[in-house]
């Protein structure tokens, strides 16, 4: 089986959908290669989406959107477009993962290429 050029359909992806504290999150790329993060309240809330300010650099099936939540501060962490390239990472403001605050891109910081002082993949 080949995944050449396909994104959003990867059998190995483990954190493209995430459930945490009464909310469900999903991440994917649009046909124009922008990263999207969506959320809904459980059990049956409607999905709300936001577009992050990052476009996929290459249509490679290994470039998945990975989501995580920090239980310490309620931040949502998003890593994307990281196959054989530098890291592209963004996190939300504290508490967004556990609150009903508005779901808008301005609740996330700028896309960066490091974690702390460590540049990854440059």
What are these regions (language model features)?
Residues 1-122:
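Extracellular, repeat-based ectodomains that mediate carbohydrate processing or recognition
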């Amino acid at each position: 089986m080949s995944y050449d050029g396909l994104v959003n359909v990867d059998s190995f992806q483990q954190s493209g959908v995430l459930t945490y504290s009464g909310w469900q999150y999903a991440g994917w790329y649009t046909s124009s290669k922008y990263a999207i993060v969506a959320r809904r309240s459980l059990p049956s809330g409607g999905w709300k989406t936001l577009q992050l300010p990052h476009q996929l650099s290459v249509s490679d099936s290994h470039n998945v959107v990975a989501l995580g939540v920090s239980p310490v501060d309620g931040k949502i962490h998003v890593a994307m477009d990281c196959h054989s390239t530098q890291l592209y990472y963004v996190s939300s403001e504290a508490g967004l993962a556990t609150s009903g605050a508005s779901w808008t891109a301005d609740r996330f910081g700028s896309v960066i290429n490091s974690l702390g002082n460590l540049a990854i993949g440059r």
